[in-house]
């Protein structure tokens, strides 16, 4: 990539229909894990006008008793879907439950790996990526980091009553200008937020007071002032946005995988996270790859780092562990790959133990990004191996 360029990432709010589905799926995973942390869960959710459908596979101890319908309603309530005017109301919506158990054919390979019978095998084949860079203190790419913060603030101001005309659904997009390969300024901010009907002058034009409130109360308090140089603001650029959430679009678990990760700054293996227990390497190995990449950057061994891992179903050991630093590493990438394999156990059991993943910690991950957040449950954000890696690299 050229040294001077524009790069864009987007995020969506907790009230976006796909994120509603993600949060319900992870709330159900957490509820099952509270009673059986070794359960196998693949919880999928569909949301539409007045309807939630819960499907997938859950295998747990016989004594596990989870009120799936109530969890779906509680999640809708927390997000803010508490009024029939919004197209879905936690009190009156229909909730269908259609769970099966995990296939025995899959379970036999996960329970005992073909290459190591003392370890569990990967729950599926696939490839996963982790990434870190020095653009922000959180070691995340700046565009996705700030896109998340915008919709997070939209929800905060909606819920605390400071901007009472806001409704749950919203999307943000940040276009960053890079100079010499580093963030220089923000070229464009797009923020589209659902609102009460009185905020538009015409179907195609928002009130000036609405636009001013969004810019002054949501956008400017979040973005670094030094980056707001001739920045263009596009606020509800199509105009009226009253119909939103599951009424505006059908929501499905796993449809916001780039929002969930790095905003397009690195490749994605294609597997979604929400609703999946950590025996599914789609989730756990992606978390581990972030942990590895972040520790490499925190150690000062590279300014940016991309990790690829790949697995075969029923096999514990990864097919490959590959490090790319795009020329920013202080030692060759192949030496970094060797260090990673020496100091990180990337077998499924190793990941679960290393990151303490058999806990009900997942609902919080399902909105505003799985990475780059300072939450005590997010063990994959620790940089506790940075000093070890630096010493092992000879620094």
From Swiss-Prot:
Binds 2 divalent ions per subunit. One of its GO terms (cellular component) is cytoplasm. ATP binds at residues 16, 169-171, 240-241, 249, 255-256, 272, 276. Its main location: cytoplasm. It holds the Pfam family S-AdoMet_synt_N. GO terms for biological process: one-carbon metabolic process; S-adenosylmethionine biosynthetic process. It is an enzyme of class 2 (transferase). Keywords: ATP-binding, Cytoplasm, Magnesium, Metal-binding, Nucleotide-binding, One-carbon metabolism, Potassium, Transferase. Residues 102-112 are annotated as: Flexible loop. The keyword Disulfide bond does not apply. Mg(2+) binds at residue 18. It catalyses: L-methionine + ATP + H2O = S-adenosyl-L-methionine + phosphate + diphosphate. The keyword Metal-binding applies. Its cofactor is Mg(2+); K(+). It comes from the Bacteria. PROSITE patterns: ADOMET_SYNTHASE_1 (PS00376), ADOMET_SYNTHASE_2 (PS00377). Gene3D superfamilies: 3.30.300.10. It is found in: Cytoplasm. Homotetramer; dimer of dimers. Belongs to the AdoMet synthase family. Catalyzes the formation of S-adenosylmethionine (AdoMet) from methionine and ATP. The overall synthetic reaction is composed of two sequential steps, AdoMet formation and the subsequent tripolyphosphate hydrolysis which occurs prior to release of AdoMet from the enzyme. NCBIfam families: metK. This is S-adenosylmethionine synthase.
């Amino acid at each position: 990539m050229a040294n001077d360029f524009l790069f864009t990432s987007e995020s969506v709010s907790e009230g976006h229909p796909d994120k509603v589905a993600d949060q319900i799926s992870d709330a159900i995973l957490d509820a099952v894990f509270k009673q059986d942390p070794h359960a196998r869960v693949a919880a999928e959710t569909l949301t539409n006008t007045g309807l939630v459908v819960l499907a997938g596979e859950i295998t747990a101890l016989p004594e596990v008793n989870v009120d799936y319908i109530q969890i779906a309603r509680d999640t809708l309530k927390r997000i803010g879907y508490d009024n029939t005017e919004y197209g879905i109301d936690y009190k009156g919506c229909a909730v269908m439950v259609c769970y099966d158990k995990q296939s025995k054919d899959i379970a036999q390979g996960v329970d005992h790996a073909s290459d190591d019978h003392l370890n569990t095998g990967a729950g599926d084949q696939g490839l996963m990526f982790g990434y870190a860079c020095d653009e922000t203190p959180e070691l995340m790419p700046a565009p996705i980091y700030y896109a998340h913060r915008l919709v997070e603030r939209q929800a905060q101001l909606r819920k605390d009553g400071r901007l009472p005309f806001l409704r749950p659904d919203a999307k943000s997009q940040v276009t960053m200008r890079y100079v010499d390969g580093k963030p220089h300024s923000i070229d464009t901010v797009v923020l589209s937020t659902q609102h009460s009907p009185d905020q538009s002058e015409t179907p195609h034009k928002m009130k000036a007071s609405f636009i001013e409130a969004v810019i002054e109360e949501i956008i400017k308090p979040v973005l670094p002032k030094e980056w707001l140089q001739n920045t263009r603001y596009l606020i509800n650029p199509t105009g009226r946005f009253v119909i939103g959430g599951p009424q505006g679009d059908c929501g499905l678990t796993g449809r916001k995988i780039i929002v969930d990760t790095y905003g397009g700054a690195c490749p994605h293996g294609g597997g979604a996270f929400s609703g999946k227990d950590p025996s599914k390497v789609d989730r756990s190995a992606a978390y581990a790859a972030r942990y590895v990449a972040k520790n490499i950057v925190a150690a000062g061994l590279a300014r940016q780092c991309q990790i690829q891992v790949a697995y075969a179903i029923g096999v514990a050991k990864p097919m490959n562990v590959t490090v790319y630093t795009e020329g920013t590493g202080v030692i060759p990438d192949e030496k970094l790959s060797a260090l990673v394999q020496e100091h990180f156990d990337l077998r499924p059991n190793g990941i679960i133990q290393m990151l303490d993943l058999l806990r009900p910690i997942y609902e919080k991950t399902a909105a505003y990004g799985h990475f780059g957040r300072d939450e005590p449950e997010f063990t994959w954000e620790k940089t506790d191996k940075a000093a070890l890696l630096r010493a092992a690299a000879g620094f």
